[in-house]
Amino acid sequence: MDNMIYIKIDNDTFYDDAIVLVRSFYPRMEVKAYKQDTVVTEDDKVIDITVPDMTGLNKSEMHDKFKSYLYDRLSQMTGKTLPWGYLTGVRPSKIAYVMLEDGEDEQTIKKHFVNKHKASEKKASLAINVAKKEMDILNKIDYKNGYSLYIGIPFCPSICLYC
């Protein structure tokens, strides 16, 4: 069994994205940055990451492209997929909520989760259902004639690897 996983990456901009995804695929392993003076034992694993070309992409698109690339690579290395795909550090229902507000239909939102974020169909449906419930609650609040305080406490029945 591996003792440690070291991430060797050619662009530190994506280090945080990389460490979170690697930890998601290897939840019981310690993950650290590979440095020039790192001593690697035969039980350790080094994941060498070359960041793909990001020409013409904005910051958000670059991070999505990198996470998609690394997710595919880690999935291939481990033979595993993650229920929420590469989504980490974000409430999936927020993505669905914004898309519903923008008038997108449920099928389009589900395809977005599955194709872009690599989430399972089951989790995509869950995000949509939670977003619809949030929307129903928030639509009942009278913003004009009083004060409202909304505390975003997740009521999602699943526990994400990063939650």
Task: Enumerate the predicted regions with their spans.
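N-terminal pre-triad scaffold of radical SAM enzymes
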Residues: 90-97, 133-163
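A short, structured N-terminal alpha-helical element that caps or precedes a catalytic domain
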Residues: 1-83
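Extended interaction regions within the primary functional domain
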Residues: 27, 42-45, 58, 83, ...
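SAM-dependent transferase fold signal centered on methyltransferase-like domains
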Residues: 1-5, 37-44, 87-102, 115
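N-terminal [4Fe-4S]-dependent radical SAM core
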Residues: 74-81, 101-149
